[in-house]
Structure formats: C-alpha cells, structure tokens
Amino acid sequence: MTILTHTLGFPRVGLRRELKKAQESYWAGNTTREALLAVGRELRARHWEQQKQAGIDLLPVGDFAWYDHVLTTSLLLGNVPARHQNNDGSVDIDTLFRIGRGRAPTGEPAAAAEMTKWFNTNYHYIVPEFSKGQQFRLTWTQLLEEVDEALALGHKIKPVLLGPVTYLWLGKVKGEPFDRLTLLKDILPVYQHVLAELAKRGVEWVQIDEPALVLELPQAWLDAFKPAYDALAGQVKLLLTTYFEGVTPNLDTIIVLPVQGLHVDLIHGKDDVVELHQRLPVDWLLSAGLINGRNVWRADLTEKYAQINAIVGKRALWVASSCSLLHSPIDLSVETRLDTEVKSWFAFALQKCGELALLRDALNSGETAALEEWSVPIQARRHSHRVHNAAVEKRLAAITAQDSQRENPYEVRAEAQRARFKLPAWPTTTIGSFPQTTEIRGLRLDFKKGNLDANNYRTGIAEHIKQAIIEQERLGLDVLVHGEAERNDMVEYFGEHLDGFVFTQNGWVQSYGSRCVKPPVVIGDISRPAPITVEWAKYAQSLTDKPVKGMLTGPVTILCWSFPREDVTRETIAKQIALALRDEVADLEAAGIGIIQIDEPALREGLPLRRSDWDAYLEWGVEAFRINAAVAKDETQIHTHMCYCEFNDIMDSIAALDADVITIETSRSDMELLESFEAFDYPNEIGPGVYDIHSPNVPSVEWIEALLKKAAQRIPAQRLWVNPDCGLKTRGWPETRAALANMVKAAHNLRQAK
C-alpha cells in the first residue's frame, strides 16, 4: 500500500499578503470586484502548484476563504442574517463582507456578526447565527467553482468541507432560545447536495472537518454524529478530519461512523498510533498528522518515522500536517535576514510540505538517510548558547508566593487610586492604540530600512504621540494613551525588545479577514536587556495633566501570539516573560506613570480544549499575570484588557488576576458577557466595550447610552468605565474621532442624568 501526502489546508493570504491588499483596495472602492476575484484565482493556482512541486500528492481545495472558512460555510448553507441580506435574496461576495465587517461596497451597513477564536488558535472565525425554524439551501457555490478550477489545471484534489456537527457547535442562537442541534436535519440536505455535485465531478475523497470531535462534548452532540454521517454516506469517500487534540476519548463515537478514513493530530493529541490502528475498522484509511501545522520548527523526521513505521503496510496510510497550514508562514526560503544557524531550525508551510514528502519516501522505501540528514540541525539546537540563559533560569527558580501578591487588597488600593486620580463617574478611556496612518507606517519602515536616522525617527514618533494627546484632550477623554505610534504589533514590539525572540521578514499568518500578524518566534530563555516603553510613556505624560496609561502586552498573550519553543513548557515561557515585564512595571511606576495596562486578550484562548485540563493552565496563567503586576504600589492602578471572550466558565480566574480595572469586548454580544460578571459578583472595576472597532460603522450617542444603561443594570455604575471594545489601530481617524466623540457625549449625558 503506497503512502500518500496531503495537507489539510494552505495559507491563503499570499507570500506578500496579496489577498489582504486586494481586499482592502476593494473595500476602499479603489479596485473592482473582478480584480479582487482575479487575485483569488491567481493565489489558489499558485498555492496548488507550490504544494504539488513540494511533494504533496492530494491538494486541498476549499481551504481558500475571502474572509473566513466558517463564514464561507454559512454562505454555502444560505445562513445569512436578515440584516445582511440583499433585497432580492441573492448572495454575493459583498454579502459575505457585510456579515464579517458590517459593510461592503454594496448594500446597507449593518452590525457585523460576532467574531471569536477558532478553537485555541490565534485565527478568528465569524460566528454563525441560528434562529428557530430557519431554512437552509445551497446559495454559495465557491467550493464547486474552486474544484472546477483545480481540476481544469490537472490537479489531484481533495475538497475540504467544514462538517455539519462542528458547524452547528460553533454557532450561536439569536432571538428565541432553542436547541441549535435540532437544525442538523435541516442542513444535511445541503451537505448531501454538495457531496453529490462533487461526486459528479469525479471527486474520490472529501476531507470533512469535525474538530469538535476532540472536545468533551455533551452526549447529545456525540450522539448526533451517527445519524448525520448515515445521511452523508455513499456518494464519495469521506476523510473524517480532526485536529488540535487527540480523539481517543471519543473513539467509540468515531469508529461506528460510515466514513472511509480518519485524520488525527499526532502533534497536539496524545493518541497512540498502534492503539488507533487496532481500534479503527480494518478498511479505514488513517491520515497521520505528523508535521506540526501550528509552529515553525523543523520536524525531527527520524522521530516521526519511528512513531508511524510500526503500522506501515498494515493499513492504508497517508501522512499529513497536523492541521491546516493556515497557521504557519508560507516560505522560509525568502527569509534572507535570519541568522543561518537559527534559520536551519525552522520550517514554514512549503518546507513542511517538503518534510511530508521526505517522510513519505522514507516510509515507502525504508531508506532513512535523508531523514537523518534533515534532523541534524535539531540536535545542534539543543546545545546552542542562543537557547539557554543561566541567569533567567535561576531567577525563575527563585520565585516565591509573595512575588505574585499586591501589597493590599482591591478595596484598599481603590481608595488610594480614587484619591490620586479624582476621576468623574463613567470615566472614559481607550484601549491603547490609535490609527496607524500611512505616515506612521512609512516612518517606521524608513527607519527600519535605514532611510531615516534615529533622531529624525524619534522626532517623527514624538510628533504623532503629541497629536494623539491633543486629539484626546480635544475629545474630552479622562484617561489618555500615547497611541502606540512606535509599535507595529502589540506582541512583535515587545518581542523585538526582549532577548530570546527572533523575527521574520515575511512570516505573516492570517488572524481574521484581511488582518495578518507576523508572530515572533521564541528561540530561547527570555529577559529584558533595557526598559521598553518607559521613554514614550513618560514623554506622553509630560504633555498633559490627565493620567496617561502605560501600555504592556501581558505574558500569556505574548506566549499565545508567538511561535513558542517546544523544548520547555508553556508555563516556563510565560513566567520568564512575566519576570521581564515585572521590571517594566517597576520602571514605569518610577517614571511617574500611575495607570498601567497589561493586556491579556489571549488568556482564554490559551485554554486547553478539554475542560479537564483547564485548572492547571489557569493556575500558571493567572500566576504569570500577577508576577507581572504585583510589583506595583497601591496607588498605581493596574488595568487589563480582554477580547473575544466567554467569561462565565473562568470567572474565578478572571477575579484572581486582581486587576483594578478590566476592559472587555462586549458590544457585538450586546453586553451579554456582563452576565458572567454580575452572576459572579465581580468586585473590581469594569469597562465594557461600547462599540465594535472591527467595523468602520460609527455608533450613535443613543446606541452607546443604551448599552451603558444595560451595563448599569448588571454592574454598579460607580464601578463602570466607558471605552471602545479594542484598540483603534486598524481604523481611520475620521471614524475614530466621530465614534469617540459620541462615546464621550454618552458618558457626559449619563453623568448629568445621575
């Protein structure tokens, strides 16, 4: 039995972020829809050919998305919220953009659909909305069109489809409450229709993604898989695909399904290959996810060979990435500035395809010399001086319980802070960043390229900070920020100033829609060689009598939004970062900064997928935050910010952070997230986000007032702050001014109504 290679998906955005640029040009009205569609076609053709040339036997089709693959599935099923529909009921690419962004070049603006994290990754999906009695039909044929494209190019393909049970699991009920699982019978005919169309095109295998099968699902959801797949059986071969965790706990549910193969993630799961082989039906194909799709490290192919070789020849076998390569940068070969030694430790998406081809060839032939050669740099890395720092390891080992305790409890600190800041009721602030204009980006780029000297760069940044302070004072905000003009990304900026990180030139990965991030890579022990944010925070504070917040990204978020080391635990990395940033808090405080925000938007997304594993993670995640913050004096107010979060199941841990103020993203969920804080009787101060910064729509004063009044029904008004959902980096100044002016006006109205 010949072993084949395949990937579960490939990065969409293009090596130079061509998709991002085309999307944003289209949204701005600077290019046509036809030009946008042409960019998509060119990228798909290029990516299929690149994977094929790298040694992939079966190419994924349907992994491309104009915004998000879950949103693509919603359109496929005709699941379009009424507020986003075209008047004639048709569906087009602007429908998709209205759901994801709240507006598009055509159609009326409307509130964007909710966005949240894709399992425990840094990718976001648009949450499907379900209503009682909803109807579904095939309305968006993107998958079929892309299959036709790939077949016309002569490729051997494997279409990719998000499975029906996971799709329903990922959604939310809107309006009258009901069990969304009851919609399964209504969406299955659309899936049957799609599979029939694929069969007509001669497709043999379809990858049907059911990552919900790695979760601790309620029994009713587990029971839904059998009737669902009974309905889908018989038209094509189905590769039931899971990732991000192991499947052994749910294997009894899986092995009775009428599918022809199973993909398992052998990186993040703890499944034993031999046990899987013994328990799976004998005629099933096993797709082994042996190459990590979520990190950038070169694989130890000798180890992978040993892991899978025991079942070679005993059943049909494919080798694959653990998950979609969407989460990896595209091509290491274009990284010309990386140190040669460090570069030899990495593999990006195309190199991972090459790793699969090497592994396939070795497993088919029994010859392992090429694998041994590939793995040589991995052995060298284990002993590199770049990896180990004795001083950091010693400091980490010396941490005591006292290092994570503030001097006094919140009630005492709050009195000291009220006396220091004398803020009005409903204090207004922003989350940190202001619009990253063309001028700001150009300034940073010129400096990075050496076209601008340090003095002129600093003068330029200082001017942008000054303008941000002037804008905020003009708007009447109570607590100001410096605007972060000097920062390209909230994680990358800190990584650039901490030892133990390296950076890529083109290591972009998609976060959502057109937003891409370039995560730093943790290659060794982490320390802070010098203050990072103090100079600019101190300068901003010198420009105003109002308090200016110091802005830090928290240790868990830096960990979650970086590519981590694989030779130490995540806890070790987080606590090393916490110790480095603890020194930054002390330096900010010494420089006269009285309010310091430590953002932890990723705290919840870092949760293990299985609830039984949560406690251990939350214990060290909370401890890392507290180590970072606990050096602050009582009169220094510590803020934290979180977004895309469901809080009700981790409220104990949110409270345990002991931040004086927490700002959260609530506008897209209509303040429903505050239910968790109300039920828990959360004791500290809260800033519920009053408008969605991911949409360019400007909220009215009345809209914001209504949200704040709703918030005050749950949280005492004296503990409420007024702020946007998130940072304003991606917005333009006109909409930012308008939205913040309305926000400040709403706060003033509520003060007067007191």
UniProtKB/Swiss-Prot annotation:
Secretion signal span: none
EC id: 2.1.1.14
**UniProt xrefs under NCBIfam families:** met_syn_B12ind, PRK05222.1
What is the originating organism of this protein? Salmonella typhi
Binding-site residues for L-methionine, renumbered to this chain: I431, G432, S433, E484, D599
Protease among the record's keywords?
A: no
Family per UniProt? Belongs to the vitamin-B12 independent methionine synthase family.
| Catalytic reactions of this protein | 5-methyltetrahydropteroyltri-L-glutamate + L-homocysteine = tetrahydropteroyltri-L-glutamate + L-methionine
GO annotations under biological process? methionine biosynthetic process; methylation
How does the cofactor attach, per the note?
Answer: Binds 1 zinc ion per subunit.
Q: Catalytic residues? A: H694
Q: What does this protein do?
A: Catalyzes the transfer of a methyl group from 5-methyltetrahydrofolate to homocysteine resulting in methionine formation.
- HAMAP family linked: Meth_synth
Q: State where L-homocysteine binds.
A: I431, G432, S433, E484, D599
The cross-references to PANTHER family, in alphabetical order and at most eight, read: 5-METHYLTETRAHYDROPTEROYLTRIGLUTAMATE--HOMOCYSTEINE METHYLTRANSFERASE
What GO MF terms are annotated?
Answer: 5-methyltetrahydropteroyltriglutamate-homocysteine S-methyltransferase activity; zinc ion binding
Q: In which pathway does it act?
A: Amino-acid biosynthesis; L-methionine biosynthesis via de novo pathway; L-methionine from L-homocysteine (MetE route): step 1/1
Please state what the protein is called. 5-methyltetrahydropteroyltriglutamate--homocysteine methyltransferase
Which residues make up the binding site for Zn(2+)? H641, C643, E665, C726
**Which residues are involved in binding 5-methyltetrahydropteroyltri-L-glutamate?**
R17, E18, L19, K20, K117, R515, C516, W561, E605
